[in-house]
Amino acid sequence: PEAIHQTLSQALNGNALREDFLKDAVIDFNQIQQIQIIACGNSNQKRMIAKYWFEQLIDLPCQVEIASEFRYRSPVIVDRTLYICISQSGETADTLAALRDTQKRAAAKHLMISTLTICNVATSSMVRETNHHLLTLAGPEIGVASTKAFTTQLTALMLLVLKIGQVKQTLADSVLAEIAADLWHLPKVILAALQKDTSILGLSELFVEKNHCLFLGRGTEFPIALEGALKLKEISYIHAEGYAAGELKHGPLALVDNDMPVVILAPKDDMLDKLKSNMEEVQARGGELFIFADENSGIQSQDRQHVVKIPSVSNWLAPIVYSVPVQLLSYHVAVLRGTDVDQPRNLAKSVTVE
């Protein structure tokens, strides 16, 4: 919560953007016609959420790319594009290489592009080599699996969306003020989610002997389903997959049986009724449900359906909040299984080689 508050403080003054926020950026946001986000690892989940925000909130097209694929497929470089690199360390090898390649190819074609890094390290290569940067004030993060860097970078992305929407006048002042107020409330909601720790520990005991797990979400919770699956496999070594819940009938449902835990992310939004239908499909096949549900969703615990109530939050900010319980679940499962939570096997905090 404190890291998020620090990140907000550099951008917001009350329910408005600070006048000096990104004021010194050598980027003309008004000229930007589309966004291209490049990232690796769990930053991929952040870019997917940001795509929803850029397109739904401020009507700005947004493409998202895995850096390790982007740099090798000779992508079309489009004029007046803002390329955003997301990296906790600012040294991720594939993301840095993709940035340099994009800059080189744009210069060769005399295209007007801009580059921006969202990063947690002020002295990093990406910060030095992009037109501007937005620092997340998360402080040191020792463990390989990103936690507070994940939530603060999502927060920074939302702040960037608000800034560009304000400059381009595609975001109403009233909407900006509403989201700003919700952002200030976010640390308190995150703290309340963290206080569900005991309940989540109870759920984790049911995962210890499992070998597989599914995570399901809709809308901006689909990337959080991917994040939950990534965290579980990273630190507990349980094979886990994240899916958009609407894709359940297109393959994942074949995996569901009475030994398959299925984690559901259920904020109270326009997709909730459809998500409940997906839950019924899992139950009909004998699957056991573990649901992180909005406290006002009406979803209750019952036989083979375990519910942890999550504090209500703005739909725009729900993915930031729902990342916390999936992180806690993965942490507790890993501890109970006796794995090294901070230094999981075969992985490094910063991937600086290909």
Model-derived features with residue positions:
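Active-site-adjacent beta-strand anchor residues
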Residues: 193, 265, 319
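Glycine-rich phosphate-binding loops that contact phosphosugars or nucleotide phosphates
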Residues: 30-185, 218, 265-308, 329
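Generic C-terminus detector
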Residues: 301-303, 309, 313-354
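Active-site phosphate/pyrophosphate-binding segments
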Residues: 1-36, 122, 129-261, 334-354
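Residue-level detector of functional hotspots within protein domains
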Residues: 15-21, 48, 56, 69, ...
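Hydrophobic membrane-spanning alpha-helices of multi-pass integral membrane proteins
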Residues: 260-268, 322-323, 327
